[in-house]
Amino acid sequence: MNRFSDIDWSFKKLPPAYGFHSVELVSIDKALQPLEKQIKELSRYVKIAKKYCNFPNEHNLSKDQSASIYIYTMEWQETSLYRVLNEALRSEDRESLKIWFPYLKLFDTALDRLPTVKGVVWRGVALDVGKNFTKDQAFTWWAVSSCSASVNVIEKFLQNKKDSTLFLIEAINGKKVSGYTQY
């Protein structure tokens, strides 16, 4: 599984994750420090993200903001940051999200500086989940959803599996992170 095809189709009715906007903006090291017990070798991946992130950059992101996007896109084992974060965002235990608030604040302030995407983006899952959705259905994905403007990118991740589902999403307020990712 990767961040382009990670999806939860349980349609949970969860309350929003209120509160992260009001926490202090801190460095990526400080934001992720409380998660080091949950994510193996996290401090190593933070160093890699800070080394290779796009800084300086055209959108005036700080090094920590740029690294917060970069580390989200990094793939490593089952404890990749995006997997653990999205698992927490999908959890019914909303209190467990508080440990993520400093990172979410940093990540959100970074995304706020990036261009907004309006129009068609693509997402896929290597399972046939089409029966769980209807045309024009509105629902909330309780996770950070990586998409691509190119259907070919998503098809590559799906590897031509017969039972795959390809989503065409009409984005209203997406963020273009290309240029800030590991790829």
Mark where each language-model region is.
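Intrinsically disordered, low-structural-confidence terminal and linker regions
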Residues: M1-A31
